[in-house]
Amino acid sequence: RVYDFFDESWARPVPVGGMERWCISCDYGTVNPTSLGLWGLRGGVWYRVSESYYDARAEGRQRTDGEHADALERLAGGRPIWKVVADPSAASFIETLRRRGWLVEKADNDVLAGIRTTAELLRRGRLGICQGCADALREFTLYCWDEKAGGDRVKKVHDHAMDDIRYFAASVA
């Protein structure tokens, strides 16, 4: 596993009280799943407090960019979102969000550096994954290295929440 130290015992309760800042991270997929994470900053720790995960294959239909943007808006829930950190390859989705008034930053997509940053922030307690984030918690247990590819490459499965978390860690945290 990529994050071999991480298991469900790392899951934290959502902190009680307000957050200092809010951010959303997203890994966009048309056929592959789209994973959105809602992050709140409190006392120097970014908490993934909620998420939205849509798997078009499992649901039997693809969503439009507008439908994904609606899901992001529902996830935001009226909170003052500082910015959205998005999959840099999701040009049409980024444009849809910008037209709706969201401040969107293209994420740093260096996979290995992002994995190292994510692991370090988790170990130092600077990133917390909250108990209600079932898809992220599930993917942490399944995300693994591709032994057949040679070198440091991850398997491109069970990586959608992992990618949005990596984008967040590399670009914001």
Predicted region positions:
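Alpha-helical architecture
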Residues: 25, 137, 157-161
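Acidic catalytic cores of enzymes that act on phosphate-bearing nucleotides/polynucleotides
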Residues: 18-50
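Acidic, Mg2+-coordinating catalytic module of metal-dependent nucleases/exonucleases
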Residues: 155-173
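Mg2+-dependent endonuclease catalytic cores in nucleic-acid-processing enzymes, primarily RNase H-like
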Residues: 37-156
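ATPase catalytic-site recognition across NTP-hydrolyzing enzymes
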Residues: 1-28
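Short, well-structured alpha-helical interface segments that form or flank functional binding sites
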Residues: 31, 92, 159
